Amino acid sequence: VGTAVGFSAILMAEYDPVPCQITTIENYEKRIPIARENFKRAGKEAQIALLEGDAAEVLKTLEGSYDFIFMDAAKGQYIHFLPEILRLLAKDGVLVSDNVLQDGDVIESRFAVTRRNRTIHKRMREYLYTLTHSEELVTAVLPVGDGITLSTRR
């Protein structure tokens, strides 16, 4: 969820030991043609499907189950994407969420966070709480870089 210019999708397609099909979602119109061109240059356009639109809406249209979901989209929306992510995540599937510690801001008081970032801060804290207290998931929060979570579906 969140393609940007396609770097992560290409990396996963290139190094997955088992040939897989990757579905990725992007909403920012300027990045979409760049990602498509990058997929083509990497020779991965047949392996990577890029769905255009708001992830909250696109996720609702997806069917089946996914063994692995990588979330690197609008940080304030992670909590809103989660119900659909859980619907799609296979049993024993893995959810990786990137940038969850927001440069360390997530552990700060909301008053220490700049006013314009308070909503993202609040939602990310709610997201982390939900992941770590969910009966459906086992989650580890890794303080690497900007923070990452690894969640496995029970």
Protein language model regions, located:
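S-adenosylmethionine/decaboxylated-SAM
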Residues: 1-154
